[in-house]
């Protein structure tokens, strides 16, 4: 299925079944809603992964549906890659590029 992409998508690319999808940073509203579950991420929480992917992809592909993501686009093998891609795009993963809080840098 083909979805229209916004003119200037932002985020991180991830190739799924031969197609490049651009996973955008989560909006504040989506992050706020999902934060309690994001703090204790369990890879077997497939509903959370579908919600995260939907919140991300909806920003770059306005016509995409959660059902398409959960039922057709993603499979169990994509769980970690999708989660890491979205969290990285959203700035919710420490990358080692900047000192962590409390790190004196000495």
Where are these regions (language model features)?
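Short aromatic-centered micro-motifs
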Residues: 14
